[in-house]
Amino acid sequence: METFLFTSESVNEGHPDKLCDQISDAVLDACLIQDPDSKVACETCTKTNMVMVFGEITTKADIDYEQIVRKTCREIGFISDDVGLDADHCKVLVNIEQQSPDIAQGVHGHFTKRPEEIGAGDQGHMFGYATDETPELMPLTHVLATKLGAKLTEVRKNGTCPWLRPDGKTQVTIEYRNEGGAMVPERVHTVLISTQHDETVTNDQIAADLKEHVIKPVIPEKYLDENTIFHLNPSGRFVIGGPHGDAGLTGRKIIIDTYGGWGAHGGGAFSGKDPTKVDRSGAYIVRQAAKSIVAAGLARRCLVQVSYAIGVPEPLSVFVDSYGTGSIPDKEILELIKENFDFRPGMITINLDLKRGGNGRFQKTAAYGHFGRDDPDFTWETVKPLKWDKAQA
């Protein structure tokens, strides 16, 4: 039977781009806790010994940006120059302005509009995807790459592998077969892990520890065989990492944040954006739509696209593709989605409770993926029971 290879990657919370995503979302969380109507577009960049937060924020919240930056860096493990950044001594630059009044009047009419009248914060198109190949209804390549990254962080923080440092990347290649449009994973072809480490550890110990403490607990044995290839720190040395090794910027890991290269992506990043930004809220609602279709058994794979114009509440278009796996025609799946999901930004915000801060809610999304997570704060992962007039007729 014909098979093909597909690959997804992930990066750890200590990767400089992901550090920036987490700082931007930590700022968003802080704003929403005090003022759920905060308008936030917070970017972060970092390089050796420096973190800068900048963007447009309109909020009644009293925010200590420097404290948020240092706390986030510290929690990730950036506690000395040796590991790539010193949370307590790095330079923190802040350049935050108010949201443009032109955008404000178009989007929410200075709070005079009812939720269903709130316009999209910008134009754009977003995609949601779901597949029946894992219990999370996510692609297995993405799930495994992401879980390997999370496990790396876990064994670093709990002391199992004390030689680990915060920065790291993972990548998984899987051999699939196409079963009438559905994706069926056959085996793991290649596992790649590149992790930052201290000076003391040997490459042999790195490889042994990664196999025992990271790969073994994460990748089900049934997918591994004698032909599976392992590339464990293939460059041979990764001591310098974090912002010391590479500059970081919010919004540069959008495929890791979503579906690992499966489905499609409209190009908009998530982190640091409040729910009036449809880059985020639109992508969340179409994930819920796609997931609900697959969970209901109406398709084995599903892609949903939505598009918006700035200041306009109603979406311009909604599109569905079941890749030929639908138990009913795509046209009917589309009708069903339109009947069951309200794509107006103000209504997405209410239905997914996106103004609620607290519990590090959005900061949690900023590492290890926004989708396929088992966490009540990820409201868009809730499968919605579908009402269908046609079925009752």
UniProtKB/Swiss-Prot annotation:
It is an enzyme of class 2 (transferase). Pfam families: S-AdoMet_synt_C (PF02773), S-AdoMet_synt_M (PF02772), S-AdoMet_synt_N (PF00438). Pathway: Amino-acid biosynthesis; S-adenosyl-L-methionine biosynthesis; S-adenosyl-L-methionine from L-methionine: step 1/1. ATP binds at residues 15, 167-169, 235-238, 246, 252-253, 269, 273, 277. Mg(2+) binds at residue 9. One of its GO terms (cellular component) is cytoplasm. The keyword DNA repair does not apply. Its EC number is 2.5.1.6. K(+) binds at residue 43. Its cofactor is Mn(2+); Mg(2+); Co(2+); K(+). GO terms for molecular function: ATP binding; metal ion binding; methionine adenosyltransferase activity. It is found in: Cytoplasm. L-methionine binds at residues 56, 99, 246, 277. Binds 2 divalent ions per subunit. The metal ions interact primarily with the substrate. Can utilize magnesium, manganese or cobalt (in vitro). Binds 1 potassium ion per subunit. The potassium ion interacts primarily with the substrate. Its main location: cytoplasm. It catalyses: L-methionine + ATP + H2O = S-adenosyl-L-methionine + phosphate + diphosphate. One of its GO terms (biological process) is S-adenosylmethionine biosynthetic process. Catalyzes the formation of S-adenosylmethionine from methionine and ATP. The reaction comprises two steps that are both catalyzed by the same enzyme: formation of S-adenosylmethionine (AdoMet) and triphosphate, and subsequent hydrolysis of the triphosphate. Homotetramer. Belongs to the AdoMet synthase family. This is S-adenosylmethionine synthase 2. It comes from Picea sitchensis.
